[in-house]
């Protein structure tokens, strides 16, 4: 679940009325390959991904200091054509217009049992953009970190920095911070973010929330 913006006030029950849901299933095919798919209520979007780990960081006694993986994903909005943000009755609604793709290289390092950092540069390709001046390919340099505060509690964060002059001025970079709380066989996650979407094309190129507002 991802709730709405807190600054909606009591009228929006401080974000609870604007909840967005994504139901997903991930499957580890091997110890290096993972695939997954999901469906979000935001713009009624279906998404899928594949992640392959090329290198794995090892303990003392070997020479591999980082973990290296490649993630490729795609998303498809299933909104009725009249509901599409770019809908124009004068234009044809091509199926390809609804698709977007994302590719990321993830470089991670576990410095200790408590502290992990990752850097994940990548590109998002949008088949359809709003104006002819908007690029179809959006390049970003992003990263995240995780710190264990105790045996069962960890704090983590991630930031997606889109390079300049690629998005309209009303869009923002995605910033998220949160906590992981382990309780037996479950991990509860409480995150705060300025992004509504839970798929790459959405939260990297379509974030409108502002942390300062």
Model-derived features: positions:
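Transmembrane beta-barrel domains of Gram-negative outer membranes and organellar outer membranes
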Residues: 1-104, 108-127, 138, 147-154, ...
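Short helix-loop boundary/capping segments
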Residues: 131-137
């Amino acid at each position: 679940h991802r709730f709405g913006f807190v600054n909606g006030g009591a009228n929006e029950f401080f974000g609870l009325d604007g909840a967005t849901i994504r139901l997903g299933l991930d499957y580890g095919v091997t110890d290096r390959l993972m695939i997954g798919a999901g469906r979000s209520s935001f713009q009624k979007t279906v998404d899928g991904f594949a992640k392959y780990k090329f290198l794995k960081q090892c303990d003392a006694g070997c020479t591999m200091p980082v973990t290296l993986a490649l993630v490729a994903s795609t998303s498809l909005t299933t909104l009725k054509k009249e509901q599409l943000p770019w809908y124009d009755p004068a234009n044809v609604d091509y199926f390809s217009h609804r698709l977007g793709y994302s590719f990321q290289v993830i470089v991670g390092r576990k410095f200790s049992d408590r502290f992990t950092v990752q850097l994940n540069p990548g590109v998002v390709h949008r088949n359809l953009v709003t104006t002819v001046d908007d690029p179809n390919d959006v390049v970003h340099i992003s990263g995240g970190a995780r710190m264990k505060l105790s045996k069962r509690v960890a704090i983590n964060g991630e930031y997606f920095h889109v390079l300049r002059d690629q998005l309209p001025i009303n869009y923002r970079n995605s910033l998220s911070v949160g906590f992981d709380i382990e309780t037996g066989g479950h991990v509860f996650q409480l995150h705060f973010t300025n992004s509504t979407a839970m798929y790459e094309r959405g939260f990297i190129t379509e974030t409108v929330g502002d942390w300062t507002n």
